[in-house]
């Protein structure tokens, strides 16, 4: 598991040495020749950012806030029960903050592959400046190949991610030692005083520019928490403290040592650390490492999308499982191509890692601040002393805010790009969430109580059709609109009627023994509630198969079932209380293009009948 964590969790932060110290040193030089004191200050700042933010905050503190083993901002929202918060309550405001945090990951997901692969391919320019025009085209080719590969799954090549990244961290350490040996005075930067004194003696704007650039060294730290469910807390901590942290510190200090001895190397100190004979192999290896880092963030976005759909934060989309023997190997076509468009747009628009550095960091720093806040609320909910939580999380929150403020000065240098992407995603999430509530309220007005169904079954539908009918119900109460429509048009019921509702719980996984809740309304009419976790695939056919196997639905032949599914057409109306009509129009568009319920819940296509209903919101 530790090896797996190396390949998935630490790909992003592991490739930060390609650009982080370079950008921080350039900010410290602010157009002049970088001085040894500036280099020591930058190296010290990066070291203590890694220790405070990654080692202390994430590895030791945030990883404790798990939702039955799962991490990430969506898991935090589930722990805080924000999904069903009433409008106007503090939890409803918390939901908005949390969804903004989730949306920021999409902005990060577009920037990370762009800056990572660009920074690796830019190594070609070190020995051959004439190759500079090829950097962007080569980057585009690599990224197009990466996104095209997603539909095939990464099961096979994913197995080599860990060993490849282990070799990468070994190379980072070796390069760093090679540089430190030439200028051991760089080890003085181990003292935090160098970072503090250096920042104090700088102009305010320069200090913020340096902080914003140094923050690039810790981007990717959020993956430690987001991927906790895949690898576990202990392997993630072990990989960080035993392998990643030492290798990163050695490499950053090696680059700093190189700049102390030769400030002219500031354009690309990472590749200048390497002996000339190994330069091009290092460029190739860097490209492989950045592809692995990009794959990790793409897979993370797919996983976040799945969780958000399950919890009702995003419209249903087609989700393909790329392998049957590995949990979590999924492919979301729509998200893949939207992310590809955003990433390629970033590469073509900004054109270099230096330019993209301005766009990178602001979304991640805001996300880290939101994570710290939500984790503090979870700790208080779990019974920790509020004073202790405020003291500990408050200190980290101040650090997060400082870094976010420092990154905010890059807003017009490219920081707007990930924030714009995040704003669009957050707006869509909030619109979808509000629209779903309006639709459910409209359904509730039309939904008949169970008593009416009983009366209909006993007095008006004495004749029964052979076989079993399954009616999908959005709520575990009342009569589904599809059943009401069926009785209205046919004036008959089947011998067995199952009202099936899928409920997504705020836990990542629900065990099989707790999957089905079976309630007999009257003989022949049964309500079945299938419970799934937000990390599970909610398949109705599999759920009913399990329920029958458990003996809760005797006499049901699953091959002789007809599934009746309602499909609503949303009609925005200005005279009906709700959202602004243009937002209702957006919701109607999203709902119209969402994955159909039957397909999303894995209902056998040859056994489905759909009933249409118009709903005004």
Swiss-Prot record:
The keyword S-adenosyl-L-methionine does not apply. GO terms for molecular function: potassium ion transmembrane transporter activity; symporter activity. GO terms for cellular component: membrane; plasma membrane. Pfam families: K_trans, K_trans_C. The keyword Ubl conjugation does not apply. One of its GO terms (biological process) is potassium ion transport. It catalyses: K(+)(in) + H(+)(in) = K(+)(out) + H(+)(out). The chain crosses the membrane at residues 42-62, 95-115, 129-149, 160-180, 206-226, 240-260, 282-302, 330-350, 360-380, 386-406, 411-431. It is found in: Cell inner membrane. InterPro entries: K+_transporter, K_trans_C, K_trans_N, Kup. It is a multi-pass membrane protein. Keywords: Cell inner membrane, Cell membrane, Ion transport, Membrane, Potassium, Potassium transport, Symport, Transmembrane, Transmembrane helix, Transport. Its main location: membrane. Belongs to the HAK/KUP transporter (TC 2.A.72) family. Transport of potassium into the cell. Likely operates as a K(+):H(+) symporter. This is Probable potassium transport system protein Kup 3.
